[in-house]
Amino acid sequence: MKKTGIFAVILALSLVLTGCMTGGMIPPPETLADGTPWNTEWVNMAGKVGVERPEGFDLLTTNGTLEDMTIHYATWVRGEETEVDKDTYIYEGQVYLMTELCDSEASAQATVEQWYGQFGGNLTLTDRETVTLAGQEFELLSYDCTDSHFDRGITAIWRYGSMVLVADIACADTLELDLRQTMVDFLAGFHYA
């Protein structure tokens, strides 16, 4: 009886950990909204969005363990790794993606507005531009960092149905990177279910 109970706990824990390592416990759909088959090479964001690897970056982590599986994130990195403090490392360039599942489209839109309201802090906005890719509108916010390990970056905040998405690319000046083009290419690699 004890062995069965321990085995059940280990099995449950391994399933949870496996789910977290593959983008959460929400499985990807078989097809996208347009009927295109799901590609297993995409990073699964909450079973609603498949994301291609940004060119020149390597996947570092993907998780769906925050806030009862409503928040998922992924990080891709490029360049030299630097230790900031014990157990904290940064790279010359990092791409972050965070998604949050909301109860409704109205709630998601309110969350988008909240994200815009929080934008700033140690960042200096240098440009703001709206682009449309595959029928999806994105607002790109370019910035310089004043108190960060990075020197500059670009952020996109948008909504897809009841999901909020925040993408950010930040880099040190040592990395020659066209942030705007990198972000546009990254956003073009999103596939919606």
Annotate each predicted stretch with a short phrase.
Residues 1-9:
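Positively charged n-region of N-terminal signal peptides that target proteins for export
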Residues 16-19:
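C-terminal motif of bacterial Sec signal peptides marking the signal peptidase cleavage site
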Residues 21-23:
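Bacterial signal peptide processing site
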Residues 35-41, 67-75, 133-142:
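Short, hydrophobic/aromatic-rich segments at coil-to-beta transitions
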Residues 48-103:
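Secretory pathway targeting signatures of secreted, lumenal, and periplasmic proteins
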Residues 57, 166-193:
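Surface-exposed amphipathic alpha-helical segments
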Residues 93-123, 186:
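Long, charged/polar, surface-exposed segments that mediate recognition or autoinhibition
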